[in-house]
Amino acid sequence: HPNLPETVEIADGVNVKHLVAGPFEGLSKEELPSQLGALTSSFMNYQKQLPNDYYSLLHSHYWISGQLGWMVSERTGTPLIHTMHTTAKVKNLNLADSEKPEPQTRAIGEEQVVKASTGLIANTDAEAASLVSLYDACPDNVFVVAPGVDLESFSPADGKAAARVRLDIALDAIMLTFVGRIQPHK
């Protein structure tokens, strides 16, 4: 996005580099793979100013970024760690009646990323098992890292009880929160 800074340091020695890759809006999820060339070009232009051993580790998310990570990993000899989040094969096995299946090109791209990765991060044991059973990932290279929340940063300013009172929820009510799209595999 044009309003983002070029680089953001999120921790000591950990930077997020924003790359320009295609239009800033108006693309559907299905159209994103068409921007892989633009993403690759943008990264390669950035990377040519760096030595090949600049990175100790690459970590990509979602299959499209994984494709770029695979190429950079092969080019530089840097290990690639990848997090899928969702996969075409799992989604296609659990489609709701009205849902359109994920394209075969995505499944193929995911298979390539799995094979090219030094390690794969899954959020759950079920996700790890699907990487092994559906994508032939080596079980020794799949690591479960459950997502979490920093409760010091993200907590009600005046406590849970006050939040429940504001929302008119009984203090002893059991609460469940779901954040995400409602899909059968989730």
Model region roles, listed by residue range:
Residues 1-54:
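A conserved catalytic-core segment of Leloir-type glycosyltransferases
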Residues 59, 73-93, 103, 121:
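Active-site proximal beta-strand in glycosyltransferases
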Residues 126, 148:
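Carbohydrate-associated surface elements
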Residues 170-186:
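Conserved donor-binding/catalytic core segment of Leloir-type glycosyltransferases
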